[in-house]
Amino acid sequence: MQEKLLLELMKACTPSAIKWLKEKKEEYEHFCSNKLLPSVTSQYKKLNVSTSMLFRNQGYEIDHLYVPLTLHHEHKLEKKIVRVDQYPSDIFDLSRKVLICDSAGMGKSTLLKMIYRYAIDDIAQIPFYIDLKSLIHNEKVESVEDHLLRTFPSFNETPSKGLFTQLLEHNKYLFLFDGADEVADKYKEEVFRSVNVFSDKAKSSSIVVATREEDLILSSFYDFRLFKIKNLTKDCAFALLRKYEFKDCVAENLIDEIENNANKTIEEFLKNPLLTTLLYTAYSYSRQVPLKKSLFYKQVYHALYENHDATKQGFNFSC
């Protein structure tokens, strides 16, 4: 990612503050070149590396494994369907505050990380990705602003600290808050309150919170537009499987077996990105399509156990 691209992004996202920034040209240039741009660049690269236990220490890049997911919102007379294969500006048509809520394994975190990339690649908005668990520091909940200043220590130096606060008030950024359901229960209310207070301050920015469904979370973000992730189609699931051709495990062989063994359990697996990936993991271990859930999870367990041992020195395993 080139600095020129980020500078263009900065310019595109700050039209409302151009006059104000002209008066602070020196500080603005200092902030862009020495503070914000390096931070965004670093996060852009870091978020693209998969941290999934399925690809332990393999360095697989998320944008190479990603199959476009589709968000949908339905409420009374409102309806919106958005395929996320570029920056999804349409999800903010109804509100600048969005809640992405779905079950485990539907790809919420991956989706947020891809939206981060698209925001930069499409020169749409300057993004910030925040794991909500990280707002808990030294057993206390900190404000989003304090978290950003702590996470990016260089922001604390003048003129960056004051300028950051001013830019937050004047400009349109994108804040992606991940894992609301993963926050420890005793901190949840305070963490969610911190996000809402911040959202009110960053009046021009777009806010996205991703979570599994919980009553407390839904009520805490009641004024956010709720989006869910559509199930994968069979074609999308097969496209995902084809991206997971590791070692000598050919995805087409698995796909052929799935097509030849109609089974409701397998069809259910294919609707969920994580279960689709685990299906490949199970198949890579046994070369058999698990037609029962018990067999499926047993094969996954053994495959991951072998994968763990394969990282140890002297282990020799051929898939």
Feature map (PLM): residue ranges:
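P-loop NTPase signaling cores
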Residues: 2-56, 60-63, 70-314
